[in-house]
Amino acid sequence: MKKFLATTCLAAGLLGLGSAASAAECGDVTIANMNWQSAEVLASVDKFILTEGYGCDAELVVGDTVPTITSMIEKGEPDIAPEGWVDLLPDVVNRGLQEGKLVGAAVALSDGAVQGWWVPKYIVDANPDIKTIDDVLKHKELFPDPEDPSKGAIFNGPQGWGGTVVTTQLYKAYGAEAAGFTLVDTGSAAGLDGSIAKAYERKQGWVGYYWAPTALLGKYEMVKLEHGVPGDMAEWKRCNTVADCPDPKKNDWPKDKVQTLVTKTFADRAGPAMEYLNTRAWTNDTVNKLMAWMTDNQASGEEGAKHFLEENEDLWTKWVSPEVAEKVKAAL
C-alpha cells in the first residue's frame, strides 16, 4: 500500500512538474482585446485556450489596431494581437517584421475581411442569373427605390466611411444611374442595418454596401455580388477610393488580410503555444454566426468564446494537440 501511495505521489508530482514547466515556458501573456465584436471574442478564445490548454497566465488588455501594433513594435507589449488588420497600416507592420519586433502568425480570418455589394439569398435563389453587379443593374424591378418604385435603389453606408466612397465611385463606374438606379444615403450604420432587416422581413429586393464579418450577415443570409472584372490595385488607389476622382473604372473590391501578430520576444518563449497561434483560423461564416448569437444573447466576449468552444469542437480541436484539447474540454 505504501509503495502504491509513493508511486501515485511520484506520478502526481511528475504531472505537476510537467504542468508547471508548461506554464513557466509560456508564462505571463497579454492579449489585445480590440473594441469590436469579432476581435473581442477571438481574444477571449485565445485567452481560454492558452490558459486552460497551455498553462499560460493570460490576461486581456484594452487595444485598438494602430496603438496596439505600434506598441508591440516600440514597447514589446501586448504579446498578441489576435485580429490584426494589417492592410490598414502596412508600412508599420512591415517595419515591425523587418526589424524583428513582430512575428506574423496565422491568418486569423482565413477567407479575408470582405466588403462589397450584397443581395438577399432569396433573390438569388429566385433569380439564379443574378451573379454580378451588371446582372443586378438589368433588373431594377427587383430592387425598387422606396421613394420611387419606378427606379431601382442601391443602398449606401453613411458619410465618412471608406466603403461609402467606394460604393459611390462604383455606382458611377458601372453606370447605375443610366440603368435607372438611385444611390440611397442610409445616414448611419443603424439606418443601413435597418434597411436590410426591413427588406428581409418583407422578402423584398435589396442591393447595397455591406461587409463581413458582421453579426447582421450571421442573422440574414446575403450573397456578395461578383464585380465581373479582375482587381486592379493601382486603379483602386488612383480613383475607386478617391471621392472627387471623376473617371472611376469597374474594379473588384480587394479583401483585407486579417492576421494574428505576436511580439518576437513572446514567440521565442511561447513553445507549443506558438503552434496554436500559427494554426488557429476561422471563416467569415463561422464568425458571422457567432456574432449573431452574441448580439441576440447580449453576450460578452468571454461568453461568446465559451459558446464557440462548446458548439464547434470539430473546428477548434484541429488547432491543438489531443492532449491540449482534453484540457480545454475539461475546463468548459
Residue spans of the language-model regions?
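Immediate post-signal peptide segment of exported/extracytoplasmic ligand-binding proteins
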Residues: 21-31, 143-151, 317-319, 326
